[in-house]
């Protein structure tokens, strides 16, 4: 007798498996990308942790410890880079003041456009995504 793929039990098992795979991918790729961007733009941070966050994509503590939501992996790379650069700028400016936004937009001129798009995504499992290479160069249009 086969398993009903539409049963609640099967759906929960599939969701658990998807989350585990997503987390494993995030634990590999996000720290690598963060280190690459930090080096490129001369930021220093203390540590990076990848885990599930309930309502945000990332955070940076006063000690420059960066935490990233593993659901970032479902976003296009432009948005992932937006979040990573945002957290790196917090290593220089903790609050979202004028200096923060000037520094952020000096690195990512299309930040406002990407931020608007990012607000349409949620910090949970997204059924499908289209991502380009992590080496994609942002264009003037931002996407």
Residue ranges and their predicted role:
Residues 87:
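Walker B catalytic acidic pair
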Residues 1-82, 91-143:
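Active-site-proximal or metal-binding-adjacent scaffold patches in catalytic folds
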